[in-house]
Amino acid sequence: MVHALAAETDETAQAADIVERFLVASMVPDPQTAARYISDELKITFTGGRKYRHPRETAAFNAKRYKWVKKKMERTDIVPAKGETIVYNLGTLYGEWPDGTPFDGNRYVDRFVVRGGKIVQIDVWNDSAERLIAKQVIEA
């Protein structure tokens, strides 16, 4: 079965803009600015099933995993739903591991649920764990 995406509306365009602004603030990282775009009921699930409630928590996790990390946002897909908009942001991560080794081309998919002009849910997937495992195997 093939489903066509609905034409972009003001609501879906606004949801995509909210997500992009959130991601830009998160990459600084500026959790305070990122928090402008989230609901008080925000639920974040990171890779490995890690649960968070606020951008400052994900920034703290990323500070342990990476020396620094940024996103090359390549595509945004918008899926309108009843009472909410689902926004997928896809691309690659680049930056440095804690030991200073650079990396690039690390795929990611972020899924956002936007309701009432706020992000209420974020699901994050990326290849970082796979790359860290491969790096350890190569160095061992």
Predicted regions and their residues:
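Short, low-complexity N-terminal intrinsically disordered segments enriched in polar/charged residues
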Residues: 1-36, 40, 138-140
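Residue-level structural signal for beta-strand termini and adjacent loop
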Residues: 57, 108, 124-127
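Beta-strand elements of well-folded, non-transmembrane domains
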Residues: 95-99, 114
